Amino acid sequence: MDDIQNDQEPSAPETGIDLEKTGVPAVPSNQDGDQQNSKLPLPFALNFSLLMASRPMSTLAKAVSLLYALLKKRPKCPYTLYVVVLALIDSAAVLFIQWGMYKEPTYADPDAIDANTKLFDSIPGQLTKFVSQMWMEQKYIWLLNFLVLGMVHLALVFVLNRFWVATAIFSIVMSVFAVANSIKVSLRNEPVIPSDLGFFSSGNGGEITSFIPKNRQSLVNGTITMLIWLTIICLALQLIDGRRCVIPCHWWRPFRNVKTIIGNCIRIIAAVLSVTLLWSFTWNLGINDSWSYNWAKSLGDNPKPWSTVADATGNGPTMNFLRLAHTKTMDKPEDYSEETMAALAKRYKKSAKITNESRANKLTDNTVIMILSESFSDPTRVPGITFTEDPMPNIRALKNTTTAGLMLSPSISGGTANIEHQALTGLSLALFDNSMQSPYQELVPHQKSPYTFNQIWNSVYGKNGSVAFHPFYKHMYLRDSDYKKFGFSKLYTLDSKPEITHQDHLGTSPYVSDAASYQNVLDALGNSDHAQFIQLVTMQNHTPYDDYYPDNQFREADVSELSDDEKWDIDSYAKGVDITDQATEDFLNQLNSTDKPITVIFYGDHLPGVYNTAAADENNAIPLHETDYFIWSNQASVSAGTKLDSQTSSYTSSNYFMALAAEHLDAKVSPYLAMLTQAQTQIPAISRLVSSNASWGDGSTVYLDAEGNHVTSKNLSKEAKQMLHDYRLVQYDMTKGKNYLSNYGFFDVQ
């Protein structure tokens, strides 16, 4: 024991370091006086102490201390610099995003084009015009986009409270948006829209690089390089900037003094207000007469709901994107619930069962061809228009022998896709909120599985049960993406792959003729060994109405007392109607020669905007919204020669076409079709009428009775009001609600 007590503390190695000063504990000795593990390395604490005491580390510590002292004394960037940088970044973002909408023009004979025209038509020229229209045309579209992006930028700044970090994030997001927009426009002639974000949410984000074409890879690489450097610069500036926070605040001790409390409150208020402003602007932009809609309009915003690419080009991709981010679909019915919808489904299941007991046929035993004939209508029904020659003698005669009548259209000279959407879905535009301008662009992209009537054939014949043709461009009204959701196996257009086969034109018309359009349908019939649903949207009679066709006999046949200019357009249109009339007669004759049962639903979508004199008279509002339709079956069909009574068919609207076709075919129906059949009986025609000569906008709901008389909502019968309420419930459930009806077989043909 004495030996142990007399043991000395282990001495330090020969390094000149006093172990006691280092704070390293002594190494204990064993009973023999030897150090334990004497041959093992020195303890970690000792090694660390030695390292820290070395000259290099001492120098590094001094450098860090000096750097910290410098950082504490770093200057604060003035707020004016923030404002200047924000303005420059946002201006560049507007131009970069808009740049993606433009393409360099091509000329058939470049030598015939002067240098100034080439300059103005170039991408820099188009960008210059986009900005200069502020003082040239008093259209402040560039300023509007600048202010909107400013809202986004400021919201990021106030939420993060770090100007340079927020600027880096803003620049990255806007650059990605600009590049993605440019690539999508080059590939599909469509800008980026909110529904595209679903591509990432569905787990396909990793595949996005596969869509980048080779000629755009340099743009992507250059943008990535630019963003890397910009991010480095912004992060460096964040370190250098002595104003670490835009708004001084402290979360560690938020109530330590009055100054801290005020700073924290300002920070919270600024973040909440900036986000609320951006949210409110986006939420209301697509709603007519809202504050953001009116403010944007005052700066020159001119919504183009018929075309996202036209809207993005004219108003900016940012405005187009935010406009489609939210649209009010319709108000929720007060009694909407799962219990209500279950009871409704049960009621119409019973109705369908009763109807089907007296019907012998199936819809899917027939090929149904739904033809939207662009702008087709009878010119002689327009007040003040008189011809000595009938422009549509064949269809007029046909209407006397088959189910036919007049269709109430929502608009004049436009809104084609709205009428088309009604015909394919059975939904009525009149039941949507007035802010719903174009369901194809504002509703369908947000729906997961929208219901359309072609799906009846798909349920029997699979994915080849339905096909569509449109001899124009697929980006119009987002038909390409919407038709995929509808379940069409293919939409053949001028720019589809493969293209629509027959593209013949007549005279100098820029549009594919109806005869060529019909030939595409005939080819589809010949290539299928089963019944199918075929959708055709024609283009021949689309505006403008120039002197396309030679030997226009209606120049002489027009005896209307109108101005020469107005008569010129009307006569040009009448010639197109005459050509459609003959092409349709030939088409139906060819259908009669086949042994396949075929039924055609033919309708004009709206009247052309050429009747200025008639449109000036408010009494002509309804006649100028009535087009011609017929439902016809060929000789191979058991419904050949069928003509529904006038009480049922004289007046209707496109949402009822499939219900009328089922009745014409004596075919069994689903509960949904049973509901539409009853609705058509109670309310023969319903439409949100735009009474002016315009394609889009607000309109009042118009109801027609079986004789075509206008009926106000107050004067609807009790049964009609209940029917209308059921219709609203169904439409809400299918579009904005929980889709309860799909769980009860509401769309299944029994």
Question: Could you tell me what each predicted segment is?
Answer:
Residues 54, 58, 290, 316, ...:
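Serine-centered coil/turn micro-motif
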